[in-house]
Amino acid sequence: GYAPNMELPLWEHMDAVRHGNAAYYAYGSWFDPGCSNKIFEFKRFGGKLLLGPWRHMEVYRGCDFPQSEFDWKADHLAFFDRYLKNAPSDIDQMPPVRYYTVGDEDPWHFAADFPLDSQTNPQLRLTASGGIVDRAAEPGTITYKVRNDITVFDSMGRLNRRLEKDMNAENEKCVLFTSDPLPGDLELTGFPVAELYATSTYKDGIFMALLEEVTPDGVSRAITDGMLRGRSARLGRNPAYDALGLPYHSSMKRDDVQLSPDKPTLLAFHLETISRIVKAGSRLRLAVYCGGNGFNQPEGMPEDVTVTFHFGGSSDALLRLPVIAPNVTKFEGDGETVYAFKRAVYRHRDNCWKEYPCQQVFPAADGLHFVTKDFTAVRSTKGDLVT
């Protein structure tokens, strides 16, 4: 048969695609394993990016999340009419990113770039006592025997990453880290990153992490997941990953590493991207495991393998979260909607869009100034009111 990525590898033509003036539009679904790749493509090629609350292929048939329906036919036609027919259109004047936040009362949002302007990246420490804390962790270890009887995904595997079952039964088979209850609602939009330090009785293995929300009634449900093979742990460089602040692994044989039984290896990897509101009173949980149904262990790996996770000091295990700080970007009034971002200001009036690229953005006594060639917009805050 034909193996596209091996016989015609895209990466050999990246620059030609990027600089070939082709119009690019990436559709992504938060619960499809390919969603993260859409963001990497957007960072590499530009164009437009849509991120919705769907599973694999659900963009074309919808799902049961509120306001999740999307008129993809009209969207496709508008895009192709503009770039193939050169028909009059304001599609290239719109904010390039549109995304859906699960759990938000008004779930659809625009953005001028990804990561979002207001993304922060707090570094939380994982502790040997099973905590997720915002302070330095004491040195310690957790020893874990690899097991393969963990079932996270259903029969669709990672093609269905919308996991709604209570994970507590499977969590008993994992290494768990749990935070204190959240004092307020928390928006996560972007890529979480786990940094683990491990030694192992075998030279290779698979390491998986599941970020979960534990509700006040004790139910634990998955938010997103990520994984890394031990031999691929060596960090490299990639423009798209660099632009997102993510660890990158080439997975090339020349970069192979071997896990050591006595010297901890850094296992830094991203979890799949997501946009979600975690409610006040819930706790965050990271479940770490090294095998399970639907996953094959490395060839030659013995059945009895023990992994030791290390914490504190030079083995500072971390969980970095894409927390979105409160930030008003949408303003409505007088028949017009204005969106203000660091990259550009967008005006929407009479069903027409107009983009005004920002020459500079800076804070002043009267608010945040967005300076364009045509005007300066000022975002002011007085108490709870933002104008």
State where each predicted segment sits.
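Active-site-proximal cap/loop segments of hydrolase catalytic domains
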Residues: 1-92
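C-terminal, loop-rich substrate-recognition/catalytic regions characterized by aromatic stacking residues
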Residues: 58-59, 66-387
